[in-house]
Structures are given as C-alpha cells and as structure tokens.
Amino acid sequence: MLEMILKIDESIARCFFVKKVLVVEGDTEQVVLTETINRMPYDLKNQILSDWHIVRARGKAAIIPLVKYLKAMTIDVYVIHDGDFGVDGAERFNEPIKNALSDDDKLVVLKNCIEDVLGYSAPKSDKPFVAYKHIQDNWTDWSSIPELW
C-alpha cells in the first residue's frame, strides 16, 4: 500500500484534500486557469484555492480514465476540454468523456479550443507560452478578463 501511495502523482494526491476537482485537457488550460485565479478578488481566490484543485490530464484521451478513477474514489469531478469539432483524432473522445463523467452539468466543452475563447488563433507550437504571453499582455486584473471566458 505504501509503495502505491508513493507512486501517486502529487497532483492526483491533492485531489483527496479538496471539495472539487477540475480536470483540464492540458498545459494551456492549466496556465489560463491559474492566471485567471491569480487575478480574482482576494476572498474569491482563497475560496477557490481551498475548495478546488485543477488536474491536467495531459491529453484528451487521458481524461477518460482519470475521471473514472476520481469518481471511483468518490471525488466530485468536473471537466473542461476542447470540442475539437472536425478534428477526427480528437473529436472522437468527446462522447466517451461525457459518458465517463455522466453529468452534463459538470462538463464544459469549449466550442473549438481555448484560444478561440481567449480571442486569438491557436498557434502551431508553444501553446501554453503563447496563452501566458497573451494574458500578460491583455489582462491586468479581474475586471480585464474577457466576459466570454
């Protein structure tokens, strides 16, 4: 048992100490959410940080087993992922993710990708850095975050 505990990813281990877990597709979503939280008013930020934990699935396909595992551990799970509509290799995971979560109220499927929501075209590379740079250049505080986001 101890060996298993030692092998659990630190990010997954934190899931046991919060009320809700948000599973995101990858690094870009993690960066955007972290920067969003950093700009929240003090009380809201503290409430979010004490009640929620964000876990990167590190790929759309990995969301499914991660959700199943967290649900089996009776953890309250929510998911945000790109819709990737028209992208064959990625769109096919939308329905299995929805089925694994089995609660549409806890699922947010972005129209296409997070860059669309943020208002710029998705780059071919360095997506997390480009998102971070976009936020640094455009968001000064909570009130400057786009309403669509």
Residue ranges and their predicted role:
Residues 1-149:
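Acidic, divalent-metal-binding catalytic cores of TOPRIM
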